[in-house]
A protein has these predicted regions:
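C-terminal motif of bacterial Sec signal peptides marking the signal peptidase cleavage site
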Residues: 17-18
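Short beta-strand->loop
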Residues: 44-46, 138-140, 158-185, 200-203, ...
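Extracellular/periplasmic juxtamembrane helices and adjacent flexible linkers that interface
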Residues: 267-349
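N-terminal segment of the mature folded domain
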Residues: 31-167, 309-310, 316, 341, ...
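A bilobed periplasmic-binding-protein/Venus flytrap-type ligand-binding module shared by bacterial periplasmic
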Residues: 133-142, 257-274, 291-295
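Ligand-binding pocket segment of bilobal, Venus flytrap-like solute-binding proteins
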Residues: 184-251
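Short helix-loop capping/hinge motifs at secondary-structure junctions, enriched
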Residues: 141-147, 166, 179-187, 266-273
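Bacterial N-terminal signal peptides that target proteins for export
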Residues: 1-7
């Protein structure tokens, strides 16, 4: 980000997040119990989950104190691109829990011996409390007349996305476009690649996180369309748009799961397993599910989702694993060095 934009962009990000400061490796030792009986947890999470956990953590702390005779607990947050966050934990960031936006990030921690292989069985819904989908945020009046994925390949269009090489948000964007291309072209992979390559050639900025992409589009006023998660698009339009932005729902889009897990090795070393498990379990509570819906995340609780149908309209989505294989297969084929994404990305972008 150029220096002349840095101050305003940071102010915007702080305002939109309105959350406790992100904590990096300097706070890695904070996720533990201490001799006074106080418990401290560190939740390492993806970029645009800031708003959820800013409001969820106080709800959980209040409930925890009720259940534990007023016992003290604090929860600290670390946010960034999902895969970067997973790598940080794999390389030593002492997270008690991880709350990511794709299963491969937690599977990485399984391979590192930090999380149990059956982590999806530890919580309901395969450990996915919320889902989202990929939508388009456009400027007032939709001047480029973007109505569906196909329109993103138009000439003279500038797109802003998170970088698919390092972020879950960006990967869902790529897979959403590819899934649309396969459906629109009767599973003709060659035609799909032509479409995706043209769409990627229109990308003006590949940001290093979903929130950074939002800042670039909304605050720096770069681009005609931002491709991002439904919750991020809605919060941006509602909180900072002042009528200047509109959300476009494609007819068919990719479903984003937000899996969670206890980092078993860390929790056991610190004696925080019980608190960490209670913390994640509370994501399925009615108050937490309602909170997620109000923040435009699609809750696992079907009754809560139905009650918010006006804000979270029904739409046709696909699970990327049903089309592209397991996350290991997806990462290897599409996002490894020299993979399909690299093959289709215009050099110099």
């Amino acid at each position: 980000m150029p220096s002349k934009h840095l101050t305003s962009a940071l102010l915007f990000t702080a305002a939109l997040s309105a959350c406790t400061p992100d904590n990096g490796t300097q706070n890695a030792a904070s996720g533990s119990g201490d001799k006074t009986g106080s418990v401290k947890l560190l939740n390492v999470s993806y970029d645009v989950a800031r708003d959820l956990y800013k409001d969820f953590n106080p709800l959980f702390i209040e409930e925890y104190k009720k259940q534990h005779n007023g016992a003290d607990i604090t929860v600290q947050q670390s946010h960034g691109g999902s895969s970067k966050q997973a790598l940080a934990v794999a390389n030593g960031l002492k997270a008690d829990v991880v709350t990511m936006n794709q299963g491969s990030d937690i599977d990485l921690l399984v391979k590192k011996g930090l999380v149990k292989a059956d982590w999806q069985k530890a919580f309901p819904n395969n450990a996915v409390p919320f889902t989202s989908t990929t939508v388009f945020l456009v400027r007032k009046g939709n001047p480029k007349q973007i109505k569906d994925w196909g329109d993103l390949a138009k000439d003279n269009l500038k797109i802003v996305i998170a970088n698919p090489k390092v972020t879950g948000n960006g990967r869902y964007t790529f897979l959403g476009a590819y899934g649309y291309g396969l459906k629109a072209n009767n599973n003709d992979d060659a035609k799909t690649r032509e479409y995706v390559k043209k769409m990627l050639s229109n990308v003006e900025v590949f940001e290093n996180g979903g929130r950074a992409a939002t800042t670039t589009f909304v605050q720096r006023n770069i681009g005609d369309v931002l491709i991002t998660f439904e919750n991020e698009a809605n919060l941006s339009a509602k909180q900072f748009g002042n009528g200047e932005f509109e959300i476009v729902y494609p007819k068919y889009s990719v479903r984003m799961d937000s899996p969670v897990a206890v980092v078993d090795k860390v929790a056991d070393e610190r004696g925080t397993r019980q608190a960490a498990t209670e913390y994640l379990n509370y994501l399925w509570s009615k108050p937490a599910q309602e909170l997620g819906a109000k923040l435009y995340l699609r809750p696992a609780d079907k009754d809560v989702l139905a009650a918010h149908a006006s804000e979270l309209p029904p739409m046709e989505t696909f699970n990327p694993n049903d089309i592209f294989g397991t996350w290991d297969e997806i990462m290897s084929k599409y996002f490894s060095d020299g993979g399909v994404y690299d093959q289709l990305t215009v050099k110099g972008k």
